[in-house]
């Protein structure tokens, strides 16, 4: 089975988390944390900064690795490294996504997340209660 490794940004701002609605592919319309594939010679943090700049025209600072999760889709196995991030500069501008929403911890389950993101959401909801 094909293996895909990605990074995802859990962008935290004013007590809320940024969710983006996928604008392409099999999962168009579903929600995810923004991010993408790690390119050759790139660290996870470098990939995350690049992907957020490309997708949302923002500069973020990865603060810490929140979790790494694995999920088996029918076509591939996904490894997703999720980082808590803070905004350094900019506001979300949609270049690849249909929409973006800032969700309070109690609102995290209010959108239809991609299957791989659901476990992250459960962990994040618990983390936000601390």
Question: Which residues make up each language-model segment?
Answer:
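A conserved beta-turn-beta hairpin within the catalytic core of GNAT-like acetyltransferases
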Residues: 26-30
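Conserved N-terminal beta-strand and adjoining loop/helix that marks the start
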Residues: 1-17
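Conserved hydrophobic "DFG−1" position in protein kinase catalytic cores
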Residues: 11-12, 19, 85-87, 102
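Active-site-adjacent beta-strand/loop module that shapes the phosphate/pyrophosphate-binding cleft
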Residues: 59, 69-91, 101
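NUDIX/MutT-family hydrolases
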Residues: 84, 93-124
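Short, glycine/serine-rich, charged loops/turns that create anion-binding
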Residues: 11, 16, 24, 38, ...
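Generic C-terminal helix-cap and adjacent flexible tail
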Residues: 1, 125-130
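The catalytic Nudix box helix
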Residues: 33-65, 104
């Amino acid at each position: 089975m094909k293996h895909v490794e990605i990074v995802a940004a859990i962008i935290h701002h004013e007590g809320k988390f940024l969710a983006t609605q996928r604008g392409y592919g099999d999962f168009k319309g579903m929600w995810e944390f923004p991010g993408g594939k790690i390119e050759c010679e790139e660290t996870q943090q470098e990939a995350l900064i690049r992907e957020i700049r490309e997708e949302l025209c923002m500069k973020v600072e990865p603060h810490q690795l929140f979790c790494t999760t694995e999920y088996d889709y029918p076509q591939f196995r996904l490894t997703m490294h999720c980082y808590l991030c803070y905004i350094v500069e900019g506001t979300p501008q949609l270049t690849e996504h249909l929409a973006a929403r800032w969700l309070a911890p109690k609102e995290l389950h209010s959108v239809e997340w991609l299957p791989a993101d659901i476990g992250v959401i459960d962990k994040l909801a618990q983390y936000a209660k601390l």
